[in-house]
Amino acid sequence: MNQKHLLRFIKKSYRVDADRVVYDAK
């Protein structure tokens, strides 16, 4: 897995986590 792909994967998973946190906070 190259760094660019890894970075994209981290961004995607981070965004999903952030959405989940916002949803739980409501």
From Swiss-Prot:
The keyword Hydrolase is assigned to this record: yes
EC number: 3.5.4.6
Top class in the EC scheme: hydrolase
GO molecular function, one term: AMP deaminase activity
Pathway it works in: Purine metabolism; IMP biosynthesis via salvage pathway; IMP from AMP: step 1/1
Keywords per UniProt: Hydrolase, Nucleotide metabolism
Presence of the UniProt keyword Transmembrane helix in the record: no
GO term, biological process aspect, one: IMP salvage
Gene3D superfamilies membership: 4.10.800.20
Coiled-coil features, chain-numbered ranges: none
Catalytic activity: AMP + H2O + H(+) = IMP + NH4(+)
Self-association state and partner proteins as the record states: Homotetramer.
Annotated family: Belongs to the metallo-dependent hydrolases superfamily. Adenosine and AMP deaminases family.
Function: AMP deaminase plays a critical role in energy metabolism.
Protein name as annotated: AMP deaminase 1
Lineage: Eukaryota, Metazoa, Chordata, Craniata, Vertebrata
